[in-house]
Design a protein with these regions (language model features):
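Metal- and O2-centered redox machinery and metal/ROS homeostasis
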Residues: 1-157
Length: 157
């Protein structure tokens, strides 16, 4: 669903790639700021890489979407799962970026063991049905934000 919303961008074309990065920034930047102040799990932010790529394309960082309502450790873990999951696809998407376009953001793939560490943290935090439901809710919240940012609201329930 979100893949389809972002799949309409031709990453080989500078204008499409710029719009793709602008949509990413509307979600990633405020979400990383929220996670940095509220989550007790280390993660490697990519917002500075995204801002750098945008600057290279003469694009101004856009107005962020609100992440208000994303509360609680488990919901934030669900949100982080979506952000870190996007790193997995980012490395593949980087190959589709035009040769003269910046790709620091998409090229920031996981370091050895990072993904497994996150999955272990999710497993440890998800020992109850309530915790699992909160993680799923946080993930859905972020998927919906990304769909909105891409111009295709989805309302994933």
């Amino acid at each position: 669903m979100v893949d389809a919303a972002f799949g309409r961008f031709d990453l080989g074309r500078a204008e499409d790639y710029r719009h793709f990065l602008l949509a990413q920034a509307r979600v990633l930047l405020p979400l990383e700021a929220r996670l940095a102040t509220a989550l007790h799990l280390p993660f490697r932010p990519r917002g500075h890489l995204l801002a750098s790529d945008l600057a290279s394309l003469d694009a101004v960082v856009p107005e962020p979407l609100t992440v208000e309502g994303l509360d609680g450790e488990e919901a934030l873990l669900g949100a982080l799962y979506v952000l870190e999951g996007s790193r997995l696809g980012g490395g593949m998407l980087a190959r589709r970026v035009g040769p003269d376009l910046p790709r620091a953001f998409l090229g920031a793939t996981h370091l050895r063991g990072e993904w497994r560490t996150l999955l272990a943290a999710l497993d440890a935090a998800g020992e109850t049905e309530a915790a699992q439901a909160a993680m799923v809710s946080g993930a859905r919240f972020v998927f919906n934000l990304y769909a909105e940012a891409a111009g295709r609201p989805l309302a994933i329930a």
